[in-house]
C-alpha cells in the first residue's frame, strides 16, 4: 500500500490566489455585465521587450537547422546567460562570482520552494510576517513548519517576525537563534525595503548565529532609492550566510516565459549532525542534476537579451510604466484618506483597510461595490490582517479607472 506524505494534509485547502479566483468567478456569474479590474495577482500586462522577442525568434531558427540545433542543455544554465548575469547584475556593484555559483531556473518560485531539498526537515524557520505564501507552504510540505496552531494561524516551528506600521515594516532581529530565515526585499507583499545598514544587521546576525538567509530579490529592478541594496551580497560577509533568488518575471515580463536564477556561493556551508561543514553549492548542484533538466535554450536566449543595450532600455521603459502606475495609485488612494505603504521602490501597495474592516471583508466590499480586485493581506500571514495588497502591474488606464471607482465608492 502506497502511503501519502501526510504533511500535505496540513496545508490549507487551497492556495490563496485560488481562493481569490473562486470569489471573483462567483461575482462574475452573478454580475455578468460588471467590468472587473484586477489589481490582485502580481502578473504583468505589458508585452515582452522587443529585444527578447527577436532573440527568441533567432533561437527558434537555430533549432530548425541541423547545424545549429541544440538538445539537452546544462542543468545549471548556458554559459552565455550566466556570464551576462555576472557581468551585469553583480560586477558593477563590486560583487564577483564564478559561473559555477549561478544556477539558471524556470522562475524563482521553483527554487524558493525546492531549496529545502538540501536542508534537514527539522531546521527551525524564521519569516517576516506578512510573507509570500510559498515560503511557508513549502516548509509545511516537508514537515519543517510543525503544526498549525488554531486561533493564531501560525506554525509551531516557525518564528514570525511582524512587519507592521508600528515598526515601519522593519522586522526586529530575533533574540534567539534560528536556522533558516527568509527575507524578501523589496518586499512582497508590503512593497517596503531595507537600507544597507538595516540589511547588514541581518547578515551580522546570521554570521553570529550560523543562520542561513534565503534572500528573495525578485523585485530589485524596481528599486529607485540609492540607499536600498539590490543584492544581499552588497553586504560584506553575505556570501558566507546567504542564498539569493532572482527572477526575470517582473524585471522583463517573463511570468509566462519562466526564467530566473539562484546564487549559491561556494563559501556558503551548512553542518551535518556530526559537525562537518558541507558546501551548499555542491549539494544544490547535485540536486539540480537529478531533479532539473535545465531551462529551455529559447528562454535563456531571451533572458540574455535582457542585458543587451536595447533590452536594458526597453526594460527600463516598462518598469517606468509600472512605477508610474504605482505613483498614480498611491496618490489616488491617499487622496481618499487611506493609509498606503510601499509603491516607491516596489510595484506593490500595502493599503490599510478603513474603519477596522478585516482584509477579506474589505476585499469583498471593494469587489462588489467598486468592481476592483485586490489581495487580502491576511492571506500573507497573521500580521497582514487589516490590510490589502494592490499591484501596479495593470494597464495604465485600468489603474486610473480603479482609482476613480475606489474614490467614488469610499
Curated annotation (Swiss-Prot):
Disulfide bonds: none annotated. Its EC number is 2.6.1.83. Its cofactor is pyridoxal 5'-phosphate. GO terms for biological process: lysine biosynthetic process via diaminopimelate, diaminopimelate-aminotransferase pathway. The keyword Transferase applies. Pathway: Amino-acid biosynthesis; L-lysine biosynthesis via DAP pathway; LL-2,6-diaminopimelate from (S)-tetrahydrodipicolinate (aminotransferase route): step 1/1. InterPro entries: Aminotransferase_I/II_large, DapL/ALD1, PyrdxlP-dep_Trfase, PyrdxlP-dep_Trfase_major, PyrdxlP-dep_Trfase_small. Pyridoxal 5'-phosphate binds at residues 72, 108-109, 132, 188, 219, 247-249, 258, 293. It catalyses: (2S,6S)-2,6-diaminopimelate + 2-oxoglutarate = (S)-2,3,4,5-tetrahydrodipicolinate + L-glutamate + H2O + H(+). It comes from the Bacteria. HAMAP family: DapL_aminotrans_1. Involved in the synthesis of meso-diaminopimelate (m-DAP or DL-DAP), required for both lysine and peptidoglycan biosynthesis. Catalyzes the direct conversion of tetrahydrodipicolinate to LL-diaminopimelate. Belongs to the class-I pyridoxal-phosphate-dependent aminotransferase family. LL-diaminopimelate aminotransferase subfamily. This is LL-diaminopimelate aminotransferase. The lineage of its organism: Bacteria, Pseudomonadati, Bacteroidota, Bacteroidia, Bacteroidales.
